[in-house]
Design a protein with these regions (language model features):
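Positively charged
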Residues: 2-176
Length: 176
């Protein structure tokens, strides 16, 4: 993966961003912080948004499109969040719900997560924001933030369930 100016090469030349699927190694690599907030970053965020919407996703993290940077997007019920260099400040409660992932097409599993979170993150202009979200949005924020740490939703599952999903995804990858 060739990188420049804190984002990635090729993002401005009209190439469509491709969602990477497990077992692509970029998905397990902790992402690097974003250091430059400029027009290239804003363009990349918009290209990520287009890729997420094209796949009917609720969230997308930069590693899912092959860019190892701490950038994530979440959209739900008309709300849109850009999370750059996010940091979990506080969490409360507990919820269990079904999760899916664009990097695991057609795979869903019950995952336990906090019910409420406070997250600090920059937007694409570099402005620091604090988001307090609950229920589904808390789940989506944490799912995308996990991607930035090289953690996948299947890592929250029992070893047996995780192994079954890994095997299924590896077979799919081999068939491509």
């Amino acid at each position: 993966m060739t990188e420049y100016k804190g984002v990635a090469s090729g993002i401005l030349n009209g190439m469509e961003l491709e969602v990477r699927c497990f077992p692509d190694p970029v998905l397990k690599k902790p992402a690097e912080p974003v250091e430059e907030f400029d027009g290239e970053l804003a363009d990349f965020v918009e290209r990520m948004r287009a890729a997420m919407q094209a796949h009917n996703g609720v969230g997308l993290a930069a590693p899912q499109v092959g860019v190892s940077r701490r950038i994530a997007l979440v959209e739900h019920d008309g709300q849109s969040f850009v999370l750059i260099n996010p940091r979990l400040l506080e969490q409360r409660g507990e919820q269990t719900g079904e999760e899916g992932c664009l990097s695991f097409p057609g795979i869903y599993a019950e995952v336990k997560r906090p019910a409420w979170v406070r997250v600090e993150a920059c937007d694409e202009r570099g402005e620091l924001r604090v988001h307090e979200v609950e229920d589904f949005l808390a789940r989506a924020f944490l799912h995308e933030m996990d991607h930035l740490d090289g953690k996948l939703f299947i890592d929250h599952l029992s070893p047996i369930k995780r192994g079954m999903i890994r095997t299924k995804m590896r077979k799919r990858a081999a068939a491509r």
